[in-house]
Amino acid sequence: MSSQLQQVIEAAWEDRANLSVASAPAAVREAVAHVLGELDAGRIRVAERQAVGQWQVNQWVKKAVLLSFRLNDNVVMGDGALTFFDKVPSKFGGMDEAALRATGVRVVPPAVARRGSFIARGAILMPSYVNIGAYVDEGTMVDTWATVGSCAQIGKNVHLSGGVGIGGVLEPLQAGPTIIEDNCFIGARSEVVEGVVVEENSVISMGVYIGQSTKIYDRATGEVTYGRIPSGSVVVSGNLPSADGKYSLYCAVIVKRVDAQTRAKTSINDLLRG
């Protein structure tokens, strides 16, 4: 089934300039809707983990998400005084208590998750936003005013602190999703974007900004890398001087590896889960 879906999506993607709400063939509509349903249920993912720091991106799934915006028109949605006009419905809209209990997810008002995102059992959504195509795994907390961007992949037992931004892939268009692996702690108001991978058990301090062009400086080795935080790193914001010493530019600094003291300060609180 997956290979047939992929073929339909790939063909539709090549013909996307000719697709519209009015003209799209039924087979394309059904394929895109099916992919979004599978994403919503967590049976299909935009990216799948192969090993620590190694992910396979399913580009055709991302293409299906993008095609959905071409195939669907804006509609009025909402409740009471809150009215919206959009192409993507709420993930939890229309669910009764039994259905919500069955998800195993705690959703604190006014948290929003769009349909086509997956939120695993034991996750907590404080007043936050989870975009289409995103995957939030078990035991993760998305704290107040945090944003999980389109198609971002968030691992198990992750804490995204208040105001954190995890970048999406839809605009500007990115090749791969931003990925936060298992047991990571992302400090308040930090931003991880542009397909950066934060490997498991890492701690990103408050107010750290990491994109593909951000220098990542390892204090222990003096090495500068881009686009990936190694497993078990503790990262803070910093600056590196220019070659002529006339100015400095922002960087992210790996100051040490996670130890017992770091873990004690950033461990998740089981009292808040369950």
Swiss-Prot record:
InterPro entries: DapD_Trfase_Hexpep_rpt_fam, Hexapep, Hexapep_transf_CS, THP_succinylTrfase_dom1, THP_succinylTrfase_N_sf, Trimer_LpxA-like_sf. It catalyses: (S)-2,3,4,5-tetrahydrodipicolinate + succinyl-CoA + H2O = (S)-2-succinylamino-6-oxoheptanedioate + CoA. It is found in: Cytoplasm. Keywords: Acyltransferase, Amino-acid biosynthesis, Cytoplasm, Diaminopimelate biosynthesis, Lysine biosynthesis, Repeat, Transferase. Disulfide bonds: none annotated. SUPFAM superfamilies: Trimeric LpxA-like enzymes. Its main location: cytoplasm. This is 2,3,4,5-tetrahydropyridine-2,6-dicarboxylate N-succinyltransferase. The gene is dapD.
